[in-house]
Amino acid sequence: MAKKVQAYVKLQVAAGMANPSPPVGPALGQQGVNIMEFCKAFNAKTDSIEKGLPIPVVITVYSDRSFTFVTKTPPAAVLLKKAAGVKSGSGKPNKDKVGKVTRAQVREIAETKAADMTGADVEAMARSIEGTARSMGLVVED
């Protein structure tokens, strides 16, 4: 018989830097999960990814307090900021432009995000990423 799912916990944790401090500790502690076991497994799985990049993770907690987790690709906004070389997006994206990204960079980000995004094809996903870039105050160039 399959294990009974107790809860799903969604977090964003920096790649290779999971530790028992908030937000990881309290979120998993409430479910009775072995926090250090999760931290070691997560850090091992994300050691090939650039350290410090926020990685969304969905942790499935079972009734016997065991768990499994699925890592996703970093948020599009984080990848866009990295590509444009800016620290944060614009507070007034329609007035103040903070950086530039090329269509090639946008397409590359769309290909990276393809596993997690719903879209007909890479072009549709690239248009979605362009919209995110514009809403952050980034200019998309050809």
UniProtKB/Swiss-Prot annotation:
Belongs to the universal ribosomal protein uL11 family. Forms part of the ribosomal stalk which helps the ribosome interact with GTP-bound translation factors. Keywords: Methylation, Ribonucleoprotein, Ribosomal protein, RNA-binding, rRNA-binding. InterPro entries: Ribosomal_uL11, Ribosomal_uL11_bac-typ, Ribosomal_uL11_C, Ribosomal_uL11_C_sf, Ribosomal_uL11_CS, Ribosomal_uL11_N, Ribosomal_uL11_N_sf. It comes from Edwardsiella ictaluri (strain 93-146). CDD domains: Ribosomal_L11. NCBIfam families: L11_bact (TIGR01632). This is Large ribosomal subunit protein uL11.
